[in-house]
Amino acid sequence: VYYNLGVSIPTDYATDDSEFDLPGFWYHKNLRSPREAPSFHTSKSWNFREDRLSSPLTGVYDSRSGSTLTVLRNEQMRAEALTTHQEGEIILGGATTIGYMGFDNENGRVSLTFGYPWVETPKRYIRKLTLVNPATTFACLEPGEKVTLSWYIRESKAKDYGHCVADTWSYCMDRINPQPINTLYSSEQMKA
């Protein structure tokens, strides 16, 4: 069986009162980005591969109430199946742990979106200032095979968007607990 699991958490936050956080990739409504890059200029709803983000998280801050909602992927192992296609429906040829994170604003209210395996909509951002048609991937689940997926969902309060991002970053680092990577060569050896 080939599958793609998508989840949407609706909120009562109005799109016009909301600011978004996809760490390292999208802040506020991304309106400072050129029209050729993902932003509210192109669409009010976006989904991205979670490996494009510095942390696999989607979040929203409601400026009217000070409420925040975040979804953080809980995944320790990393695997990726390379694809031969850049757009459309893609059946993955191997194992991947990469899902997606995003948000939906089509009805004027915010929903946070996430799932597995990855989806990029309404456009796929393949390189600087290049948007192409969307992509949806499908993973194979063999008879008797088991897949476990988990995300952390968190509600909190913040006095403004800056505090929301700072609090989310601390929460993310506490949950993910990144460790230094042991490299084969020192910086000096690499520069030599």
State what each model feature region is:
Residues 1-192:
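Carbohydrate-recognition beta-sandwich/jelly-roll modules
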